[in-house]
Amino acid sequence: MSEKHPGPLVVEGKLTDAERMKLESNYLRGTIAEDLNDGLTGGFKGDNFLLIRFHGMYQQDDRDIRAERAEQKLEPRHAMLLRCRLPGGVITTKQWQAIDKFAGENTIYGSIRLTNRQTFQFHGILKKNVKPVHQMLHSVGLDALATANDMNRNVLCTSNPYESQLHAEAYEWAKKISEHLLPRTRAYAEIWLDQEKVATTDEEPILGQTYLPRKFKTTVVIPPQNDIDLHANDMNFVAIAENGKLVGFNLLVGGGLSIEHGNKKTYARTASEFGYLPLEHTLAVAEAVVTTQRDWGNRTDRKNAKTKYTLERVGVETFKAEVERRAGIKFEPIRPYEFTGRGDRIGWVKGIDDNWHLTLFIENGRILDYPGRPLKTGLLEIAKIHKGDFRITANQNLIIAGVPESEKAKIEKIAKESGLMNAVTPQRENSMACVSFPTCPLAMAEAERFLPSFIDNIDNLMAKHGVSDEHIVMRVTGCPNGCGRAMLAEVGLVGKAPGRYNLHLGGNRIGTRIPRMYKENITEPEILASLDELIGRWAKEREAGEGFGDFTVRAGIIRPVLDPARDLWD
């Protein structure tokens, strides 16, 4: 698919300003430490505004009150988002208690936000609390290093509670890959943890002095579940097991969903199969993929800098051969694998080790005490008595993992009393949104605040057409950067302007096909009118077991995207 347009291995030209910033930052230090002490502004200035992203933070402001503050001649109410590094989403109950306390006492919104990259975020950290949050994380063995900007981000791992042996092995690899690809600079420890400056020269043997051209995302996935949505990621290790034991991985490279409205040089892309590798080559191959992208990725245009664009420019076979050369291996042919779904199994599931796992549906991943539903307090109470761990899923849900039979009733009682086990429809369980307003500076339309009532309306349509026990993978993202992974949904809404979305159709349930734009810049009533008609047709005309996305393609409602680099915008 990608050998049609082989281009130069390295793009020559004027480097972006981000490249200058990284080069001049002294390995990500900048003047962040000095800026912390500037009480005249609640934000970070100049390069530091972007450099803090390498330390796991984004500077934001409350957009609901931005205009009001401007009228009062006040600067925006700056506050930081902090994203924890949590490979595979596994967090101990001691760690949970610490983050619960910090969220309640030191953030504007008081919430913990589970993300679809298997970690948690704090929103609304004022500048005075920035250093304390890093120190709190460090005190319980966590950090926020490399969870944003041009590095390998939080490594995902299938949250499969049943296959406990396989999950344990895959999770260990997710941690190893994460550690191996971390930056080596001591800037994080010096700035946030007050560790002494050591008189050695910083080196970044893998990432290099200017780090990666763009963000880089990695997964470890255990078929048949594609809960981590591998095709949204740059580098994916698909677990291959023999007799229940992990023996190696299929490698898929070059997925990614971010686009720009109207810019046909941007596209969502599914990852390409490179081949199979035995376990012992995992870290060498991971490093080789990252360093190839480091050296060949486009540093002259950030909108064309991700791995997916590098693959399309140089060709898949050329990129693959370079990875083989650097890793000193030859890929074996891809081993058979298949995906059957991506949703979480909500409720109790018994593992093969006789322990139980309770998956709790958390709408939009937002953990807060709501009227009559004290979710945050309930989880804190469970954390105080639970001997196992918690696992954040890539669907923004939470698993109480490793519950002995004797503890089940106690934990279920707390969960039910806190509203953590309220019954929801299959449709709601399979819907997701990014944060968007009021905190995200890129948001063009509502997402998290829009989704609950939107799904009420979809539930009504599903009931009207007699398919309430079915679901459609439905996602809303507030802008085309695509954090809500709408570009792998059966029905994807991509924010265009306040109250307006592009409606994409034709993805599939297992997340292996990019949906195509069906209608542009439409309102919620227009979206619902379209879906009313289409859900009605699906209910009447579908074949046995046929998902909504597959139906829209077979019925000729939408043309499938076959080669997104070339036909996404047709």
From Swiss-Prot:
Gene Ontology BP, a term: cysteine biosynthetic process
Annotated metabolic or biological route of this protein: Sulfur metabolism; hydrogen sulfide biosynthesis; hydrogen sulfide from sulfite (NADPH route): step 1/1
Reaction catalyzed: hydrogen sulfide + 3 NADP(+) + 3 H2O = sulfite + 3 NADPH + 4 H(+)
Requisite cofactors: siroheme; [4Fe-4S] cluster
Leading EC class: oxidoreductase
Molecular-function annotations in GO: 4 iron, 4 sulfur cluster binding; heme binding; metal ion binding; NADP binding; sulfite reductase (ferredoxin) activity; sulfite reductase (NADPH) activity
Keyword terms of this UniProt record: 4Fe-4S, Amino-acid biosynthesis, Cysteine biosynthesis, Heme, Iron, Iron-sulfur, Metal-binding, NADP, Oxidoreductase
The EC number(s) this enzyme carries: 1.8.1.2
Gene3D superfamilies according to UniProt: Sulfite Reductase Hemoprotein, domain 1 (3.30.413.10)
PROSITE patterns linked: NIR_SIR (PS00365)
Domain of life: Bacteria
Cellular component, GO annotation: sulfite reductase complex (NADPH)
Residues the entry annotates as binding siroheme: C483
Positions bound to [4Fe-4S] cluster: C434, C440, C479, C483
Annotated cofactor note: Binds 1 siroheme per subunit.
Binding partners and assembly: Alpha(8)-beta(8). The alpha component is a flavoprotein, the beta component is a hemoprotein.
Similarity-based family: Belongs to the nitrite and sulfite reductase 4Fe-4S domain family.
Cross-referenced NCBIfam families: CysI, PRK13504.1
HAMAP family the UniProt entry points to: CysI
Role according to the record: Component of the sulfite reductase complex that catalyzes the 6-electron reduction of sulfite to sulfide. This is one of several activities required for the biosynthesis of L-cysteine from sulfate.
Protein name (database record): Sulfite reductase [NADPH] hemoprotein beta-component
Source organism: Escherichia coli O157:H7
This protein's encoding gene: cysI
